[in-house]
């Protein structure tokens, strides 16, 4: 019972995390669109980091079963929310956009860093707005962000190569991030 807890505890683990193989940070990674939707905000607000990642884990399993390491999760309205462990950004015609927080995603620290610091420093216009899957498929570039994911280029599973989504914008943005150290 939560009210019987006399003293709260905090556990901190400090370690280097590398979510993906080193090559994916430079060459990009394929992503699929998960069949499982993101939980509605009214049921479990994903902006609260409560460690309840069951929905994300099930979508991640779906991706891994397809031979892919990451999946884009849609909300129950069919709009892009986030990936299983990362925020998603789209570059189209020189504008960087990302789903707004109403889409039902965790408001990531690295996401905010791109919005507040990186994009403006490089002269990009940034928009927080709704995205359809077609927006992702029609993007000039797609990248994922996260504290552990850093900045990772992405491509549709159907795309021929991740290079199709890695243009000059990604290289410029990537210069603001240090990739995970290779041991």
For every predicted segment, state its role:
Residues 1-157, 163:
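Helix-start/capping segments and mature chain N-termini
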Residues 158-183:
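N-terminal auxiliary "cap/dimerization" subdomain that precedes the catalytic jelly-roll/cupin core
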């Amino acid at each position: 019972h939560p009210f019987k807890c006399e003293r709260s505890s905090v556990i901190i683990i400090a370690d280097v995390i590398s979510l993906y193989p080193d090559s994916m940070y430079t060459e990009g990674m394929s992503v699929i669109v998960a069949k499982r939707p993101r939980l509605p905000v009214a049921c479990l607000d994903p902006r609260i980091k409560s460690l309840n990642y069951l929905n994300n884990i099930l979508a991640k399993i779906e991706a891994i079963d397809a031979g892919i390491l990451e999946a884009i999760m849609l909300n129950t309205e069919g709009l892009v929310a986030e990936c299983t462990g990362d925020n998603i950004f789209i570059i189209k015609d020189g504008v960087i956009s990302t789903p707004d927080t109403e889409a039902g995603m965790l408001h990531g620290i690295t996401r905010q860093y791109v919005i507040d610091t990186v994009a403006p420093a490089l002269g990009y216009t940034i928009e927080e707005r709704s995205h359809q899957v077609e927006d992702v498929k029609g993007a000039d570039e797609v990248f994922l962000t996260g504290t552990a994911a850093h900045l990772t280029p992405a491509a549709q599973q159907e795309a021929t190569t991740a290079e199709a989504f890695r243009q000059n914008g990604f290289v410029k943005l990537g210069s603001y991030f240090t990739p995970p150290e290779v041991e």
